[in-house]
Structures are given as C-alpha cells and as structure tokens.
Amino acid sequence: MIFQTIRQQQPLIHCITNYVVANFQANGLLALGASPVMADDSHEVEEMVAIAEALLINIGTLNDRTKEAMLLAGKKANTLGIPVILDPVGAGATVYRKETVHLLLTDIQFAVIRCNKGELAALVNVEWQQKGVDSGDGFIDIETEATLLAQRYNCIVIVTGEHDFMTDGVQSQWITGGNSQMTEVTGTGCLLSAICGAAYSSGEDPYSQLVETLTYYKKAAELASAFTEDIGDIQIALLNALHRLSKEGEASCIL
C-alpha cells in the first residue's frame, strides 16, 4: 500500500509552498513518514532540492521572491531527474498568477499537475469565474481538457473535487469517495499535492502509485469525518487517519 511504502522509504520532499498551508503540509508528510523541508529562498533552493526526492511548487501566496526560487529549484530538479509537482493555486484569479504559471510550465518539466477544475480552466484558457483561490463557477469538460493538458506538457494531470480525475494523456480514470468536510477547511488539496510528490518518488510505477494515493486519501477523509463532525477538528482527524493508514494499511479503513 502506497502510504506504507512512503513510511518505509521516508522520502525528503522539498516544498516551495504558501504560508497558509505550510504547517499542515509539513505535518501531513510527517504523518506518513516522509520528511518535509520548506526552503524557499533563492540562495539555497538549488542545494536543497539536490538532496530531495521530489519538489512541490505551490503558488498559493505567490510573490516575486518565491517565483525566482521556484524557477531555480525547478530547473535544478529537472537537471537531476527529480520529479516536480505543480499546484497552480488560484491560477485564473489574476493576470500575475496566470502569467507565472505559464512561465513555470514553459521553463520546467513537471511530472504532475494537481489542480481543481477552476485551475484547470485557467491552464487551458476556458472561461471560468474564479473565486479567489477557490474553484469558482463555470463549465469544463474535465476529461477532454485534462487529457489534452497532460499530452501538451507530457505529465500526469490530477483534477480533484467531489470526484477526482487523473490522466497521463493516454490512460485515465475517475476516483470516487471522500467527504465534503475536506472542502470546509483550507489546505487539504495542497497537502494532497505534497503527498503526490512523496508517492511519485516512492516506486517504479508513478501512475499506479498516484491512483492509489488518490484512493487512500479519500479513504483518509472518510475516516476523519467518521471520527468528528466538528470542522475545527477535521484537520487533526485527517492527520491521524493518514498516520494510521501508513502504519496499518487497509486494515485501518474499516470504520
């Protein structure tokens, strides 16, 4: 089981991420047995990524300083064959974000793009009403557009929501399950992106490893929601569920 594999391998995941979710991401990776490092200064990111198993680039609180660090770290990771994950948070909310994501996609070869449907719309230029960094409203053919995006950038595209869609441009599938409480707190999607980095780097079949990751992340959400109905406790419950899954495997899925 992929979460157990992550615990066994203990990959170091370099996260250049946003300050809203950095603590939650770090604790989520630790819950699975991975090691997080959140370095984002341009003076050290190339050195730091060189000792990591994967790099996460998350643009949630984007600024010029972290933009430079993202480009440096991403290019270095490409040189070293280290997988890079992109979380284009709120990509369609502003021109600055959209232009930055385009630059990142042009200059860096990403292994995975993990987004919601509003962010997917921004990446493929489909009209969409973005609501800040949240998904917003509109219509998009997720299967078609995600597949074309995966083919264009030669990567795996994961579009998360009530149901998750994943494709590498050839094979694809939907993953169901989860719980709506995950949308009522910040950071659950951002944490998933970090976990995708840990999963991608923990075996020889990244596609299958990511399918399993999405499946068991939804199982973790179900376990967490079964533990509490109080929204203030859901993040803690999710961390506990991830920890249990990484130690006990599928046995812990029995509610």
From Swiss-Prot:
GO biological process assignments: thiamine biosynthetic process; thiamine diphosphate biosynthetic process
Gene3D superfamilies, per database record: 3.40.1190.20
Needed co-factor(s): Mg(2+)
CDD domains: THZ_kinase
Molecular function in Gene Ontology: ATP binding; hydroxyethylthiazole kinase activity; magnesium ion binding
Superkingdom of the source species: Bacteria
Pathway per the UniProt entry: Cofactor biosynthesis; thiamine diphosphate biosynthesis; 4-methyl-5-(2-phosphoethyl)-thiazole from 5-(2-hydroxyethyl)-4-methylthiazole: step 1/1
Catalytic activity entry: 5-(2-hydroxyethyl)-4-methylthiazole + ATP = 4-methyl-5-(2-phosphooxyethyl)-thiazole + ADP + H(+)
UniProt keyword annotation of tRNA processing present: no
Keywords recorded for this protein, A-Z: ATP-binding, Kinase, Magnesium, Metal-binding, Nucleotide-binding, Thiamine biosynthesis, Transferase
Pfam families: HK
InterPro entries: Hyethyz_kinase (IPR000417), Ribokinase-like (IPR029056)
Residues that, per the record, bind substrate: M38, G187
EC number per UniProt: 2.7.1.50
Binding-site residues, ATP: R114, T160
Described function: Catalyzes the phosphorylation of the hydroxyl group of 4-methyl-5-beta-hydroxyethylthiazole (THZ).
NCBIfam families: PRK09355.1, thiM
Family that this chain belongs to: Belongs to the Thz kinase family.
Protein's name according to its UniProt entry: Hydroxyethylthiazole kinase
Annotated organism of origin: Lysinibacillus sphaericus (strain C3-41)
Lineage: Bacteria, Bacillati, Bacillota, Bacilli, Bacillales
